Amino acid sequence: MTQPIKLLVGLANPGPEYAKTRHNAGAWVVEELARVHNVTLKNEPKFFGLTGRIMVNGQDLRLLIPTTFMNLSGKAIAALAKFYQIKPEEIMVAHDELDLPPGVAKFKKGGGHGGHNGLRDTISKLGNNKDFYRLRIGIGHPGHKDKVAGFVLGKAPAKEQELLDAAADEAVRSLDILIKDGLSKAQNRLHTFKAE
């Protein structure tokens, strides 16, 4: 059996002006999971974020959306993980992924940061440990690296947003499978999904 996941983090920038930007795609998953489980995320200053707690398949799962800026996300994750004695390999971080198209989401265990500042800070604050799970929500790529900053901080057009929402919803459903049956079964489900 794979290591149980005890903390799901949705990476985001704080404030209403960023709420619907592509860079906040990870947070949408946590918000949707909280909604499905009828839990209100509460601001918790000592964890530098919005937190909640749900039960998935009989397992306790803490939710966190850091309210730091993206490049300081690790501070919130490390604070909560330390307090509840959650190991890096019991953490899943949901984030926007330039290398996947909108409508696609994938689970992954371990790996580098791929230039994502939220992941970079998380790895650093977890003592350079890269063993946490990732939930990659595809947002597509603007085509040129110079356009990336504007792209991730921009809002998706309506049709594209539908694809992003559908992938986030499917990721939430697949998370149940991951917690119950492990990573490979969850990957089989999520990785065959593509919103059209």
Curated annotation (Swiss-Prot):
Catalysed reactions, semicolon-separated: an N-acyl-L-alpha-aminoacyl-tRNA + H2O = an N-acyl-L-amino acid + a tRNA + H(+)
Annotated positions binding tRNA: 18, 69, 71, 117
InterPro entries xref list: Pept_tRNA_hydro, Pept_tRNA_hydro_CS, Pept_tRNA_hydro_sf
Function: Hydrolyzes ribosome-free peptidyl-tRNAs (with 1 or more amino acids incorporated), which drop off the ribosome during protein synthesis, or as a result of ribosome stalling.
Name of the protein: Peptidyl-tRNA hydrolase
Main location per the UniProt record: cytoplasm
HAMAP family reported in the protein's UniProt record: Pept_tRNA_hydro_bact (MF_00083)
Active site residues per record: 23 (proton acceptor)
Site (Stabilizes the basic form of H active site to accept a proton): residue numbering on this chain: 96
Entry's Gene Ontology cellular component terms: cytoplasm
Coiled-coil annotated spans: none
Subunit structure of this chain's protein: Monomer.
EC class name: hydrolase
Pfam families: Pept_tRNA_hydro
SUPFAM superfamilies given in the database record: Peptidyl-tRNA hydrolase-like
One GO BP annotation of this record: rescue of stalled ribosome
UniProt xrefs under CDD domains: PTH
Locations listed in the record: Cytoplasm
UniProt family annotation: Belongs to the PTH family.
